[in-house]
Amino acid sequence: MENRWQVMIVWQVDRMRINTWKSLVKYHMHISRKARGWFYRHHFESTHPRISSEVHIPLGEARLVITTYWGLNTGEREWHLGQGVSIEWRLKRYSTQVEPGLADQLIHMHYFDCFSESAIRKAILGRVVRPRCNYPAGHKQVGTLQYLALTALVAPKKIKPPLPSVRKLVEDRWNKPQKTRGHRGSHTMNGH
């Protein structure tokens, strides 16, 4: 019988970022109660030696599973130190991997207050708009003009500590696109 390999995307993340993510998840599960229904599985509850933790986030019938790993091969940089994160969407026996932005949107739609189409209509008519969007990380990069006007009208509340964002967890802070000088003096452009 030959070996079967399963390949999955694991985002390389530094250890401190993973620790921050875990503490934010635990805080919002146990203290603020904004993450009601989430399940945190510790490393000693897993049979896999490389899994450091799992966070199960119910999304209706489906669930999002964010798994953190340790002891992986070290990455390109010395600060990676073999830490990583995978993000999976599961429904019954089906599972697929999702990117961090989509994971944030799924969490946002199910767990946090946000504007709706009716809120935009109410604001245009001059009525009071509630609720505020408490989780702006769950929105796409550029919203509609109405949404942008609404966010200017009703600013989100600053929540301390912030809500856990999967996109922030896997964000690469060190490998920003390198700036190079253009052919006209000091103008800069992305060097790809």
Curated annotation (Swiss-Prot):
Protein task: Counteracts the innate antiviral activity of host APOBEC3F and APOBEC3G by promoting their ubiquitination and degradation. Acts as a substrate recognition component of an E3 ubiquitin-protein ligase complex: mechanistically, Vif hijacks a host cullin-5-RING E3 ubiquitin-protein ligase complex (ECS complex) and the transcription coactivator CBFB/CBF-beta to form an active E3 ubiquitin-protein ligase complex that targets APOBEC3G and APOBEC3F for polyubiquitination, leading to their degradation by the proteasome.
Region Disordered: start-end pairs: 172-192
Region feature (Interaction with host APOBEC3F and APOBEC3G): 54-72
Self-association state and partner proteins as the record states: Homomultimer; in vitro and presumably in vivo. Interacts with viral RNA and Pr55Gag precursor; these interactions mediate Vif incorporation into the virion. Interacts with the viral reverse transcriptase. Forms cullin-5-RING E3 ubiquitin-protein ligase complex (ECS complex) by interacting with host CUL5, RBX2, elongin BC complex (ELOB and ELOC) and CBFB/CBF-beta. Within the ECS complex, Vif interacts directly with host CUL5, ELOC and APOBEC (APOBEC3F and APOBEC3G) substrates.
Pfam families: Vif (PF00559)
Positions of modified residues (Phosphothreonine): T96, T188
Protein name: Virion infectivity factor
A molecular-function term among this protein's GO annotations: metal ion binding
Disulfide cysteine pairs (residue numbers): none
Region (SOCS box-like): 151-180
Chain residues that bind Zn(2+): H108, C114, C133, H139
Site (Cleavage in virion (by viral protease)): L150, T151
